[in-house]
Structures are given as structure tokens and as C-alpha cells.
Amino acid sequence: MDEQKNKDRIMQVATDLFQEKGPKFTMDELASALKMSKKTLYVYFTDKEDLFHHAVDHIFDSITDAKSKIITDETIELRERIIETLQVLPRQYQHIDFRQLYMLKDKYPRVYEHLSKRLESNWETTIELLEKRQREHVLRDFSIPVFKTIYESTLEHFFERDVLKANHISYPDALREVVEIIMNGISE
């Protein structure tokens, strides 16, 4: 098995453990679930923080790939492409309890900071879609930087606090609700 396949497998099992235990799972538990030695695990990731850092990249790279497919799909009406782009969550991550991400802030602040930076990046194609819809008068004139800030701040708030967990709202449901509220607020 090649190195990337091993890393992907490790991240998938780590994702499953994260879903089950949050960030509190141990590298021993991960190695056991993978049926590999901890020593082998550390060949791929220096520590749990490194694993989480790579997992953030893996998730956001998957989201970026999914967004690209949506944006270039001419069979989807433009307004629907905006909605789908804003609420995209690849199938392999639908089961993750993103509500637990707020726990990373204290224990793994560098990972959390990296997550925040990734959340704020790769907006170019979404912004192009919004601008196009404004030019076509399908969306009213509004400040795209304010729109982006509202969206990012809401998601960061979900990650920073346990508001979703406390109110028994899943991350995908919250994401759909946010997009619905935002889109209904900017539609002509």
C-alpha cells in the first residue's frame, strides 16, 4: 500500500474515532483500530496534532474539490450553485460531529487556528458566482465582504462554542439553515 493510501486510511479511522470520542482519543487507540503499531503510525504523523492538522487539510481539500465540481456544473441553476457551494459537505464527512471542533481550541490551538484560516480561504469562485448574480440582477446589490464575514463568523461561532451541541442541532442542519437565512436575505 502506498504512503498516501496509508495516510488516507489513518485519517479515515481517526475521523471515526473523533466522531466517537471527540479529540480525546489516544494514538494507542488509533493504532489499535488500524491494527498497526504506534511506531508505524508515527512514520506518517509525528503526533496527534500533526494528524489533526493534516485531517483539516484533507477535509478542506475535499470541500474545495466538491465546490469546484458544483461551480462548473452548468446543469445546476446559478442560484442553486451558490446555495450548494455554501453548504457543501462531502459525503465522507457527513457523519462527522463538527460540533466537537470547539474542543480543539484549548487543547490544539494551532490546529484550530489552521482550521480558521482554511475556513477563510478559497472564496474566489464563490465570490465570482455572487458577483455574476449581482450583475444579472438576480441578487440585490450587497457587500460581498460583509456577506463573507457573516458566513465565516457564523461557522467559526459554531466551532468555538457548543451552541449546536447544546441545542441538539447537527452541523449539516445548521449549515443548511445558515445558507437558507443568508440566501433568503439577499435574493431579489
PLM region descriptions:
Residues 54, 68-95, 148-151:
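Hydrophobic alpha-helical connector segments
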Residues 84, 128-132, 165-188:
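C-terminal peripheral helix-coil segments that are non-catalytic and often amphipathic
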Residues 2-13, 78:
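N-terminal positioning helix adjacent to the helix-turn-helix/winged-helix DNA-binding module
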Residues 9, 13, 17-50, 54:
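Helix-turn-helix
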Residues 91-127, 135-136:
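Short secondary-structure transition hinges
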Residues 49-59, 63, 96:
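Alpha-helical DNA-contacting segments of helix-turn-helix folds
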Residues 140-161, 174-185:
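Hydrophobic alpha-helical segments that form the core
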Residues 120-148, 155:
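Hydrophobic alpha-helical bundle segments that form small-molecule/ligand-binding pockets
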